[in-house]
Amino acid sequence: MNCLATTIIITCKPTLISDMAVAIDPFSDKFPYFNRSSQRCRLQSLTNLDFNFLAQSFNHTFEDDNIHRSVSSPCFSIAASANMEEDLKATTAPRIEILGGQRVPTVRALVAEVTMAMVSGAQPLLLPSGMGGAYLLQTGKGHNIAVAKPVDEEPLAFNNPKKSGNLMLGQPGMKHSIPVGETGIRELAAYLLDYQGFSGVPPTALVSISHVPFHVSDAFSFSSMPYKVASLQRFVGHDFDAGELGPGSFTATSVHRIGILDVRLLNLDRHAGNMLVKRCDKKEAYNRLGTAELVPIDHGLCLPECLDDPYFEWLNWPQALVPFSDTELDYISNLDPFKDAELLRTELHSLPESAIRVLVVCTVFLKQAAAAGLCLAEIGEKMTRDFSKGEESFSLLETLCTKAKASVFGKTSEDSDYSHEGNEVNTELQCGMFKFDGGDTPCEAEISEVFHVSKPPLVPRGPRANTIPNDVTASMSSSQNQRITHQEKSAKEKKRGGKQERCTVRSKSPPISPNHDESKGVSFVDMTTVEWDTFLQSFQTLLQDALSKGSTPRLGCSCEI
């Protein structure tokens, strides 16, 4: 039986079992709060994976006289364990179950620490900032441990404690491409994809928390909501956020590492408020140039289900114009988008395949753009939609994906003998194949214009500038492991009319508002595995051609610092 996660039942008397259950790995995490040799508390353990399996084992024991016990609990009483499931269900003490990230030691340690604090009487404190329900969890001595965000208390959700919405889970949320209730799993995805803590995402878990006084709407009784699913992120001590200081205080390395993560995940909400500021040297003042490090938090609005308009606060910062260092280029070149996709499929089963495909596309885009010598600001600009003369136009990334997708369906039609003669049908395939909201899909003439939109000049980086990563092409041949769930195969995109014009200043953190009328963007959910592989090959070719053409600086931008 798998013993990665066990439940530690704390008892102070041989015949009494307390109401507390802690999910940890006693073999690797070295839980610091108890001494196994202590006579004050006796620890009993049992596997906490499947109570049905335990019940079946006990029935088998009584019927066949075949004693079945876990090797981790040789002294466990069969009589006591027979009622263990009922005892744990009947308890009113706080319990936490890890739903995602249980294989990561830092996640298990975080959950164990939070659980012990809560069973000792610590109460979650609702933070006044933000639009959603975020709770600060502390130890009995008042030390900050983590921040919990229940998914049903997200902005616009029906159980929001700040009365900012009444939407049910699964409806379009703050961004139409991310449904209500699905930000928590994206918080965990960002942590899992931040390999070796390169960007500094704090340890994050997806948990189920029961019998904890979170907010409950008047329309629901607590008895009907015994537990809540929430993201749990370790608290990071800080004095400011990036919005309280000028960008000149931050190191270029810190900005680059956050930007690399944002590009990979297509972060739709990287504003100054979710970048915490820490000093590199406590003796240095914050106002000195390049002395502060940034810690990224709040990744619930990343990995959208279709291409959307990202918001990168760092886009106009001077650090984003500095070329990538060799260390950063090596990190980017070693990224494997298909390995990342398989990781998310394995660890996060409920994350839609369409969101995983967005990760693959954005990672391929990042790798080729960095290899071509583009700086972070140039890459971010090519992923961001342009707003001029009262109209919003697609980004270069969206335009390339539109052309690649059109070529895929064009070839599919020819292979299926459904194609017709003449250029009229070809134009129809390119202009009417995709479902966009609030406007018509740009036709070939409009698409070609995007390749001539002025952009900052390329930054030469020696031999790297003329090489396109070969691992992307090689990985495409092995992309047969891409899977499409039954739900996604039957999903149908719904059109929403109208286009909402935005007049926000991109250098400031914009207020988030529901974007149900925005253009829906390019979606990859309607492609089969074969079509997806063909799309990636076409997309890589189009991207290589677009990057090789170069461009002139856009008005208001310069790569000189």
From Swiss-Prot:
Q: What is its EC number?
A: 2.7.1.67
The UniProt regions of compositional bias labelled Polar residues, in chain numbering, are 467-484
Please list the coiled coil stretches: none
The intrachain disulfides are: none
Region ranges (Disordered): 456-520
The chemistry this enzyme catalyses reads: a 1,2-diacyl-sn-glycero-3-phospho-(1D-myo-inositol) + ATP = a 1,2-diacyl-sn-glycero-3-phospho-(1D-myo-inositol 4-phosphate) + ADP + H(+)
Membrane spanning residue stretches: none
Its GO CC terms are: cytosol
Start and end of every PI3K/PI4K catalytic domain? 121-416
Q: Which UniProt keywords apply?
A: ATP-binding, Kinase, Nucleotide-binding, Transferase
Q: Which residues bind ATP?
A: 128-134, 149, 233-236, 298
Region named Catalytic loop? 266-274
Q: What does the record give under GO molecular function?
A: 1-phosphatidylinositol 4-kinase activity; ATP binding
Map out region (G-loop) in residue numbers: 127-133
Region described as Activation loop? 296-322
Q: From what superkingdom does this record's organism come? A: Eukaryota
Q: Which family does it belong to?
A: Belongs to the PI3/PI4-kinase family. Type II PI4K subfamily.
Q: Which PANTHER family match?
A: PHOSPHATIDYLINOSITOL 4-KINASE GAMMA, PHOSPHATIDYLINOSITOL 4-KINASE GAMMA 1
Q: What role does this protein play? A: The phosphorylation of phosphatidylinositol (PI) to PI4P is the first committed step in the generation of phosphatidylinositol 4,5-bisphosphate (PIP2), a precursor of the second messenger inositol 1,4,5-trisphosphate (InsP3).
Return the protein name: Phosphatidylinositol 4-kinase gamma 1
Organism this protein belongs to: Arabidopsis thaliana
